[in-house]
Amino acid sequence: YEIAQCLVGSEMCIRDRDTNTGNIIVGTIGQSKLIEQAGIDISALKNKKQAFMLAVSEDGKLVVAGSDSHGTAYGILEISRLLGVSPWEWWADVTPEKKETFRLSGKFRELQSPSVEYRGIFINDEDWGLMPWSNKTYEPSDVKGEIGPRTNERIFELLLRLRANTYWPAMHECTLPFFLTKGNREAAKKYGIFMGASHCEPMACNAAGEWKIRGKGAYDYVNNSPAVYQFWENRVKEVAGQEILYTLGMRGVHDGKMQGAKTVEEQKAVLNRVFVDQRGLLEKYVNKDVTQVPQVFIPYKEVLDIYHAGLQVPEDVTLMWCDDNYGYIRHFPTAEERARKGGNGVYYHVSYWGRPHDHLWLSTMSPSLIYQQMKQAYDQGIQKMWILNVGDIKPAEYQIELFMDMAWNLDKVSFEGVTAHLKHWLERELGTSCAKTILPVMQEHYRLAHIRKPEFMGNTREEEKNPVYRVVKDLPWSEREINERLNAYSELSETVEKAASKVPADRQSAYFELVKYPVQAATQMNRKLLYAQLARHDKEDWEKSDAAYDSIAALTQHYNSLENGKWNRMMDFKPRKLPVFNRVERNAATAPMTADRKAACQWNGAEAKKGNAIVCEGLGYEGKAAEIRKGDALTFSFGNLKTDSVEVDIRLLPNHPVHGDKLRFSVSLDGAEPEVIAYETKGRSEEWKENVLRNQAIRKIVLPVTGKKSHQLVIKALDEGVILDQVMLYEVN
């Protein structure tokens, strides 16, 4: 059965080969007589978008009814899910298990509809993965950088299997733009995919790739607006009739500031003019009632400052808020923004190229963090559009599915929790026996990477003026901390190696792609850089670091050879060829290693003796962070100490304010006057960069201690969004 057929047809009847009698009826309400005659109540589908119903009729037929063409497609693919077929059947080689029979109760009835209207992915930073794989391996082309319709149809099928509907195509200069590639537009139409574009691609124009081909002069709306206007106009005319979510506004040709306007006020004036002109094009070529054309404005990076300076975005345009590229959403809508007709969206990253350091390789974003931030986003009214920057798709398979499952049915994911969601995913992909062993492995893998991502292990930074930031150097960890981390990774790697025997033969490639490569590559990356750190201090052999580098290369070579070379060129362990990915240069330390410091007491946020801690499942350095609601407090108790003062280290998630621009808490010891502490960061400040790399915001305060036998440390949230990870108590000599 052709998946795309249910997006262009109105009804069908799947027949038994032997009896030629239909036992599955598929159709869209209002367009299908078969559905109307099936004898099931479909009233619940009316006035819903993208919804479907599966029900067994009185005569024993399975009826698949969609509220529209998308709903019908999702309904068909729900049968596939019920049969145990993974959405990653092709993309991660999860071979379907053959079944002779499949039974449903005569009372079976399933109704589903999305939590978020537009749900999709952004292919980005494709230079070292998806583009060369598509262009040279899967869909060989003589046209440099072409990602063609054969590749995109595979992506579109995956989106439908994930119950997604929106696509932002790859847009780097290395890639031939989507709309300039023959067959791509038609493929999107065939699969019913809404085409969108990123923050620097207004009016469906990939400025980075297209301006040099189709533009004239500078991409500057102050000094060259006629040429830029014509550039946009040509595209809008070309794609008439295509389902497009138009991005409004303007930045630089790629991920940079607007040209021609220097101050925020000047940029605001240009954007006001841009809005008028862009919406005029939509009125002229798409719909005279421009409010009926889906449009989105994305205040990303410096554009958020322009928005906060009073930029007026048309009421019907969706406002799409962004994370800071490392998983923490920068702005949640105000009550006024939530009330807008256009609604609110979010653009979220599990892959990123940029300051302070890329994370393009292993996709280790904590599922618990994704859940916490996206649940908060939904609760704060971000319910119109969710887009995930997925890099090359692989190896972000699990994060993508978690994100899409939340966008489809947030209540279900919220009810079962992240641990259960991951467990069910592993069971489907690898089988129950293997999943039982691998679940704690993947949880620990994500926890260790939350502390510090594999790409950050060289203590380097990118896109800084001072070249010293690119030199691999010691992390501020003691020898004990390093050895504990090495041991933890060794246990993971050994378990993964042994568990392979529990995986069916036809799922071995899936196991390598989804578990073995990410876990063992992360293990070897940590070994490479931590053994090098120890070797700089004459505490280990350099050969161990070199051996780890060789292991990463061998693992990657094996990945690219899987399934007779199906994935050749997809995996590159040196994206952007950054220093951290190289063999570590041998040199001696010029400063002593960080000394070990033992805390007199330490707690995780969830370990408070008193208070209304909202435990964030699996989140934080030890997976026990806790949110403190505004006005609530947590109390930590400790006994007498032989000191007259203590240093309290409060370690929090480095998230951003939920309401307003403040993120504050207070600290009080034994009923003393509370000390108010703020920890919000601004832009890409030095503190924000440090917070990103260590995944904690840290505040330290010294407090006097009386001679009491027991003490009470109280931490109170003064704003929404305070998430306490750890508290460390040190005696002050």
Regions found by a protein language model. Name each.
Residues 1, 5, 10-113:
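Contiguous, structured surface segment used for ligand recognition
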Residues 2, 6-14, 547-594:
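Short, small-residue-biased leader/transition segments that mark boundaries at the very start
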Residues 60-94, 180-204, 216-234:
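Hydrophobic or amphipathic alpha-helical targeting/insertion segments
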Residues 63-66, 127-149, 165-175, 210-227, ...:
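The substrate-binding groove and active-site-proximal loops of carbohydrate-active enzymes
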Residues 88-144, 150-170, 342-345:
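An acidic-aromatic substrate-binding cleft motif
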Residues 99-104, 172, 179, 187-190, ...:
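Gly/Pro-rich turn-and-neighbor structural signature
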Residues 165-168, 175-178, 183, 321-327, ...:
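Structured mid-domain segments that build the active-site/substrate or prosthetic-cofactor binding neighborhood
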Residues 572-733:
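Extracytoplasmic
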